[in-house]
């Protein structure tokens, strides 16, 4: 019989019961963990069938890996090192024991990939599959990053190609056979990787003034990073400087490409600002530590976002994905 007792046994079978930092193990009313940090970083995220993923084109392992990766991306945006997560599962009637076994194989894989540990969670029945995660990290050293701390003339950077995931999702929705370049774009959507190492590295640098992860689209998250218009800050980004994969740029018209890159979302790249006077040293440090970063614009005092494309300046609306209820 598939019930919560079965799931608890499944979790205990696949995950070690106790560690030196996790004395209670899975199965108690709550988890007790030991940490060396005086600052914990905590975030939560939900992945909902029909909203964030579709069972028609996701395997159970992929669902598990993606759900944890996108949650950990929020910790990376704060410069934190991920340590633990808990997961509440809401399970519909069409999910069977084989599916759950594969799902927890995915959780085991993602734990190994990020060197993190599952603390436990909760289960309940539902009309659709929902994974509700809480992720816990710790501050490395004394420094962490927040949004809104950028200053006028700071330079704006991203950590990788923008728009690939959005294009990959579009391909998934409209095709059933894929070329190799299309498979690479689809992978960006289905299997994003949190920028953990880069986030920790940037978190320790005083010259990095603010940071966010790109979840809902470059333009929308840039607006969140810069802050409300009432604050007087604005930003200008240059289209030609935004990193885009060849697979992406060759497959879309100019208008569709702009929408995918600026408003698509699901990139889970880091978007951050660096002090104007320190960019040369910053870029040297990144190169020395084998981190690729891309300068795409600067903070100004115009009170709005703007885009430079082909030498022409236009207003950039902070549009992207927003949950509507």
Each language-model region and where it sits:
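Helix-biased detector of long, well-ordered alpha-helical tracts
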Residues: 1-325
């Amino acid at each position: 019989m598939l019930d919560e007792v079965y799931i608890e046994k499944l979790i205990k079978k696949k995950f070690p019961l106790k560690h030196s930092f996790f004395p209670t193990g899975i199965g108690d009313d709550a988890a007790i963990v030991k940490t060396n940090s005086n600052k914990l970083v905590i975030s939560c995220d939900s992945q909902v069938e029909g909203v964030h993923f579709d069972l028609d084109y996701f395997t159970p392992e992929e669902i598990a890996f993606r759900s944890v990766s996108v949650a950990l991306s929020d910790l990376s945006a704060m410069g934190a090192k991920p340590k633990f997560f808990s997961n509440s599962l809401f399970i519909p009637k069409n999910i069977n024991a084989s599916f759950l076994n594969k799902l927890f194989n995915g959780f085991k894989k993602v734990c190994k990939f990020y060197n993190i540990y599952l603390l436990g969670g909760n289960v309940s029945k539902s009309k659709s599959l929902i994974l509700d995660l809480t992720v816990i990290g710790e501050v490395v050293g004394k420094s962490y990053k927040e949004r809104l701390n950028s200053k006028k003339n700071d330079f704006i950077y991203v950590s990788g190609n923008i728009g690939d995931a959005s294009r990959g999702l579009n391909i998934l929705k409209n095709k059933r056979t894929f070329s190799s370049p299309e498979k690479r774009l689809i992978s960006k959507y289905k299997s994003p990787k949190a920028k953990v190492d880069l986030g920790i590295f940037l978190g320790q640098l005083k010259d990095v003034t603010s940071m966010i992860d790109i979840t809902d689209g470059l333009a929308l998250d840039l607006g969140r990073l810069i802050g409300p218009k009432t604050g007087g800050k604005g930003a200008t980004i240059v289209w030609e400087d935004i990193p885009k994969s060849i697979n992406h740029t060759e497959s879309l018209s100019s208008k569709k490409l702009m929408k995918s890159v600026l408003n698509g979302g699901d990139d889970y790249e880091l978007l951050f600002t660096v002090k104007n006077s320190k960019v040369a040293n910053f870029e040297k440090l990144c190169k020395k530590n084998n981190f690729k970063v891309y300068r795409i614009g600067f903070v100004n005092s115009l009170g709005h976002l703007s885009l430079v494309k082909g030498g022409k300046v236009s207003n950039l609306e902070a549009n992207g994905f927003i949950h509507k209820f």
